[in-house]
UniProtKB/Swiss-Prot annotation:
It comes from Xanthomonas oryzae pv. oryzae (strain KACC10331 / KXO85). GO terms for molecular function: 1,4-alpha-glucan branching enzyme activity; cation binding; hydrolase activity, hydrolyzing O-glycosyl compounds. GO terms for cellular component: cytosol. PANTHER family: 1,4-ALPHA-GLUCAN-BRANCHING ENZYME. Belongs to the glycosyl hydrolase 13 family. GlgB subfamily. It holds the Pfam family Alpha-amylase_C. It is an enzyme of class 2 (transferase). The active site is at D411, E464. Its EC number is 2.4.1.18. NCBIfam families: branching_enzym (TIGR01515), PRK05402.1 (NF003811), PRK12313.1 (NF008967). Keywords: Carbohydrate metabolism, Glycogen biosynthesis, Glycogen metabolism, Glycosyltransferase, Transferase. This is 1,4-alpha-glucan branching enzyme GlgB 1. The gene is glgB1.
């Protein structure tokens, strides 16, 4: 109940302050706005462009009408020395009662600011960004952004008509963080930051680097996220994840692009629709994991997510952050792990993003020899800056902890490790010892992987690293980078080149098939047939295979049989599992209609069966990283383009014999030495009729004869199907 209305005369406004406020240049709004002590009480100043009148409503109900100042939107009045107040603002469209943003003290704790400055705040989005909070009984949103070289920062949004004069922020000087609590702003509000550089020049409005939600492209605003925690139902998965993802467990990864896996009438599915269709398919196909191409927010869909700007926000292209959480949750409930591609190497130059964020090279290197990547027209993160490396590590933790993601595949690691990557002499800056290694990135990756192991046990870190940099998967304590796995790019390049050759020439390239075993145990590897191999004019996996249709499909089936029995975890890009004949196009859905063709359906059936074989037999996965788990039986038959090897599991596990004929010639009576006699069972044959083959094989059973061969006391007389892979297991 109001007890009365008083009018008071405000203190005089300084003309310089008026001009700075009106031009959105004043860098210390808290020194002017809000209530400030005077000799007789307090003076209250507000700047609300567009307001027609403003009153202060005191805690006792008394209302004090503020006087309009010399500039439209300026209002001031005298208040008693003690007591709280609210603002009653008369806008052209009606009245608003609200708390004054400039009545609140500093928001972030000194400890938070210290952690941010040191790059040690692992829950960075709980401090920076937009967080819905309650302060002194008032509900609103705390905005905070790191911009140490800015001379002024304001938050603009749909709650203040995107007016940079309305909500200038407070600088916490020791950290370079600007903050402001804005009452009554809640989830769903769209916002950006309007900054001025160190010399006062206005910068393009910036999206929040730490926003947990972003506007759907082509919009570029950040959105205040709902603070309600997602209610997870994957306790069983999380409790067993470390065992499921141990080095001796099977890992078969289905790599996919969420926007083009399945399109209904040309429309992308949201996370829930994708889960409805994808999860049953992946489970039926026998993959243990899905790997999503980057889901962090990115402005250009044609980058496939590899040029992200919103490293804390799942892209809005497929729904809300909770939608992404539901997708992961549903995968886990069906026993499927989720790996996400993550890009800490570089970022695009879009004006609303991180580029020259506060008018200086803040996130990137200032020197283009270090900070600009010509191949991708992107800017390179300065991993040597504590706040930047901390920002990236916190992004990784956000997805691993908040979204229960089971692993990150770190993109473009080689481009980070070497200062001369894709640069000519004179175009790069050596390290302090004159070398090419990027010591700052090495330190960043080691710290990242050590923290992931410490704080998210059971999660895996996978490096896309294409060079011979030593110790990528070695422990940090032993001088390594600390990744769990590394993509085996050498295996992929060699074997795809071999498979693309006309069989008549393969005898001259036999080493491309066998060389991978020379270094197979130097790292812990994933065998990647990824999206990179079916784009940019390379053709599809099926399209790389030589010969007529029969030979191409047989080649593909044999190659997949080789891949799934070779040491190393498996990764197969979507569409390859049924022999997509054309390159992948992110603007189109996969050609699922091809499954009406028995040849394509046969490839799909083969992948389903070989996945189950891989999981069922420990010999095919338990010793991927141990030389005792592999033995050549026939590695030198270049003339016949045949390889044969034994895969061995732990003590008590049955060995598995793999034989592959990479020529279109049937091999009759091909003898293979084996470690024991009796009847060996043919458990897989890529030439089976169900896969689209000619059903040439060994009838399911082959009896080993007592004959010394290949270092063994027994031998199997085999029929090797043309362009075929067979797998046999011993008796017992």
């Amino acid at each position: 109940m109001m007890s009365g209305v008083m009018t008071a005369v405000s203190n005089r406004w300084d003309p310089g302050v008026i001009r700075a406020l009106a031009e959105a240049r004043h860098g210390d709004a808290f020194a002017v706005l809000g209530a400030h002590r005077t000799d007789t009480g307090r003076v209250l100043r507000t700047y609300l462009p567009g307001a027609e009148r403003v009153s202060a409503v005191l805690d006792d109900g008394q209302t004090i009408a503020l006087e309009a100042g010399p500039e439209p939107g300026l209002f001031a009045g005298d208040l008693p020395a003690q007591g709280g107040y609210r603002l009653r603002i008369g806008w052209p469209g009606g009245e608003q009662d609200t708390a004054d943003p400039y009545a609140f003290g500093p928001q972030l704790s000194d400890f938070d600011l210290h952690l941010i400055s040191e790059g040690h705040h692992l829950q960075l989005a709980d401090a920076l960004g937009a967080n819905v909070v309650e302060v002194d009984g008032v509900r609103g949103t705390r905005f905070a952004v790191w911009a140490p070289n800015a001379s002024r920062v304001a938050v603009v949004g749909d709650f203040n008509s995107w007016d940079a004069r309305r909500h200038p922020m407070r600088l916490r000087h020791q950290s370079g963080v600007w903050e402001l609590f804005v009452p009554d702003v809640g989830p769903g509000a769209h916002y950006k930051y309007q900054l001025r550089g160190p010399h006062g020049h206005e910068l393009p409005a910036k999206a929040d680097p730490v926003a947990r939600r972003a506007e759907l492209a082509p919009g570029t605003a950040s959105i205040v996220a709902d603070p309600t925690p997602y209610q997870w139902s994957d306790d069983g998965w999380m409790a067993t994840r470390a065992r499921r993802q141990a080095h001796d467990a099977p890992m078969s990864v289905y790599e996919m692009h969420a926007g083009s896996w399945l399109r209904e009438e040309g429309v992308d599915l949201d996370w829930d629709g994708l889960a409805d269709h994808l999860i049953p398919y992946v489970a039926d196909m026998g993959f243990t994991h899905v790997e999503l191409m980057p889901v962090t927010e990115h402005p250009f869909g044609g980058s496939w997510g590899y040029q992200p700007l919103g490293l804390f926000a799942p892209t809005a292209r497929f729904g809300t952050p909770d939608g992404f959480a539901r997708f992961v949750d549903r995968c886990h409930r069906e026993g499927i792990g989720v790996i996400v591609d993550w890009v800490p190497a570089h970022f695009p130059t879009d004006a609303h993003g991180l580029a020259h964020f506060d008018g200086t090279a803040l996130y990137e290197h200032a020197d283009p020899r270090e900070g600009f990547h010509r191949d991708w027209n992107t800017l390179i993160y300065n991993h040597g800056r504590r706040e930047v490396s901390g920002f990236l590590i916190a992004s990784a933790m956000e997805f691993l902890q908040r979204y229960h993601v089971d692993g990150l595949r770190v993109d473009a690691v080689a481009s980070m490790l070497y200062r001369d990557y894709s640069r000519n002499a004179g175009e790069w800056v050596p390290n302090i010892h004159g070398g090419r290694e990027n010591y700052e990135t090495i330190a960043f990756l080691r710290r990242l992987n050590a923290l992931v192991r410490e704080h998210t046990p059971g999660a895996v870190m996978i490096a896309e690293e294409s060079t011979a940099f030593p110790g990528v998967t070695a422990d940090v304590a032993h001088g390594g980078l600390g990744f769990h796995y590394k993509w085996n790019m050498g295996w992929m390049h060699d074997t795809l080149h071999y498979a693309s050759l006309d069989p008549i020439y393969r005898r001259y390239h036999h080493g491309e098939l066998t060389f991978s075993m020379v270094y197979a145990y130097s790292e812990r590897f994933v065998l990647p047939i990824s999206h990179d191999e079916v784009v940019h004019g390379k053709g599809s996996l099926l399209g790389r295979m030589p010969g007529d249709d029969w030979q191409r499909f047989a080649n593909l089936r044999a190659y997949l049989g080789f891949m799934f029995t070779h040491p190393g975890r498996k990764l197969l890009f979507m569409g390859c599992e049924f022999g997509q004949p054309t390159e992948w196009n992110h603007d189109s859905g996969l050609p699922w209609h091809l499954l009406d063709d028995p040849r394509h359906r046969g490839v799909q059936t083969l992948v389903r069966d070989v996945n189950r074989l891989y999981v069922q037999y420990p010999a095919l996965h338990a010793h991927d990283d141990d030389p005792s788990g592999f033995a050549w039986v026939v590695g030198d038959d270049a003339g016949n383009s045949v390889v044969a090897f034994l895969r061995k599991g732990k003590r008590g596990d049955a060995p598995v014999l793999v034989v592959i004929n990479f020529t279109p010639v049937v091999q009759h009576g091909y003898r293979i030495g084996v470690p024991q006699g009796g009847q060996w069972r043919e458990v897989f044959n890529s030439d089976a009729g169900i896969y689209g083959g000619a059903n040439l094989g060994n009838g399911g059973i082959v009896t080993a004869e007592q004959q010394s061969m290949h270092g063994h006391a027994h031998a199997l007389p085999l029929l090797l199907p043309p362009l075929g892979a067979i797998v046999l297991t011993p008796p017992g």
